[in-house]
Amino acid sequence: EDVIRNFRMQADGLIRYQGANGLWHQLLDKEDSYEEITGTAMFVFGIARGVKQGWLHPDYIYVAWEGLKGMFTKITPEGDVTAICAGTGIMPALSFYYNRPQWKNDPMGEGPVLRALVEMIDAPKYTEIKAEQQYDKIK
């Protein structure tokens, strides 16, 4: 019960920071940081799994689908995965995170992207009008 409650609280917190195009930023609460696919993929996977397992309200699937749409903007027609943040440890200054390089086709980003894509294969669909109305309530 504690784990599920914590999961729900984290999902509630994360969705507030999802960008208009579905992606999350390298620094979640800093819109001037770059949009990053690895974290987005992890959040899409977790939210979709949460809905499918009944841990999150079904309307949360809208957030996952919007994230997936955003992810597709960072995957080239050739299948290259872009906007992967270089490995990052805990650093003392925000400037370090702003200046992290973005990689292409790095396994640290490709793995979460593949997991998110597979999780979304059988994810529930949503009625867009209803979901858009509910999304504000979720946020």
Predicted segment positions?
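Anionic-ligand binding region
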Residues: 21, 31, 39
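Oxyanion-binding "anion nests"
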Residues: 1-27
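CBM-like carbohydrate-recognition segments
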Residues: 35, 41-139
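A short beta-alpha structural unit
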Residues: 28-34
